Amino acid sequence: MNWSIPNILTVLRLLAAPGVAVMFLYFHRPWADWFALTLFILAAVTDFFDGYLARLWKQESKFGAMLDPIADKAMVVIALVIITGYSGMNPWLILPVTLILFREVFVSGLREFLGAKASLLKVTKLAKWKTTAQMVAIAILFLGTGLEHLEGIARQGMTWEQYARAVSAGEADPIRSCGMHGCSSYATWLGLALIWIAAALTFITGWDYFRKALPYLKDEK
């Protein structure tokens, strides 16, 4: 294996995936949320640079091509499981997350079944946009969980209406509130909208891969 900089970035991104979960094991919230968000964003940035540098420096390799989608899937799956757990099992989050996880398992199974023919299921531009949408949505959802925990601390038992009045009166920290429902609500709803968009792209790309693999799934007569 060639330990080029692009390959090292890919390996680091793969290691960052379980690292996001580790943040919640060793740190209390909201620090765990902020550390997980920071680590996730840094890892997501490497997803752009490893491929870009590999093409720029002509260091593309089979190892990098194999590991890159695995690192992406590991990041997305682990992060979504964590966010879903800390969201209180919000059904508006569970549905798109279930679709995303099902698609990832399904496509991975297709690739394994096709074996040498798996090269037919090349990563498309739409699939890259799908991954980007997933990562942006996850980052915003992590932001929402962190802000929600901070606002819970800042409110100290107040209702949102009481908290909003306290902010207006200068008796509460305005940085932790964007109005009646707080910053976390805006971040969470934006993240949910993006994760539904990502789920739609996930379904479309999954169907495209299945359509391409279908001729090889028929029994020979």
Curated annotation (Swiss-Prot):
Instruction: List the membrane topology term(s).
Output: Multi-pass membrane protein
Involved pathway(s): Phospholipid metabolism; phosphatidylglycerol biosynthesis; phosphatidylglycerol from CDP-diacylglycerol: step 1/2
Query: Subcellular location, in the record's words?
Result: Cell membrane
What are the protein's UniProt keywords?
Answer: Cell membrane, Lipid biosynthesis, Lipid metabolism, Membrane, Phospholipid biosynthesis, Phospholipid metabolism, Transferase, Transmembrane, Transmembrane helix
- Ribosomal protein is among the record's keywords: no
Q: Which Pfam families match?
A: CDP-OH_P_transf (PF01066)
Tell me the InterPro entries matching this sequence: CDP-alcohol_PTase-I, CDP-OH_P_trans, CDP-OH_PTrfase_TM_dom, CDP_ALCOHOL_P_TRANSF_CS, Phosphatidylglycerol_P_synth
- Bilayer-crossing residues are 8-28, 34-54, 75-95, 133-153, 187-207
If you read the UniProt record, what top EC class would you report for this enzyme, in one word?
transferase
Q: List the disulfide bonds.
A: none
So what does this thing catalyse?
a CDP-1,2-diacyl-sn-glycerol + sn-glycerol 3-phosphate = a 1,2-diacyl-sn-glycero-3-phospho-(1'-sn-glycero-3'-phosphate) + CMP + H(+)
One term of GO molecular function: CDP-diacylglycerol-glycerol-3-phosphate 3-phosphatidyltransferase activity
EC code = 2.7.8.5
In its keyword annotation, does this UniProt entry include NAD?
no
Q: Name one GO cellular component term.
A: plasma membrane
- Among the record's GO biological process terms, what is one? phosphatidylglycerol biosynthetic process
Q: What does this protein do?
A: This protein catalyzes the committed step to the synthesis of the acidic phospholipids.
- State the family it belongs to: Belongs to the CDP-alcohol phosphatidyltransferase class-I family.
| Protein name in UniProt | CDP-diacylglycerol--glycerol-3-phosphate 3-phosphatidyltransferase
**Protein species of origin:** Cereibacter sphaeroides (strain ATCC 17023 / DSM 158 / JCM 6121 / CCUG 31486 / LMG 2827 / NBRC 12203 / NCIMB 8253 / ATH 2.4.1.)
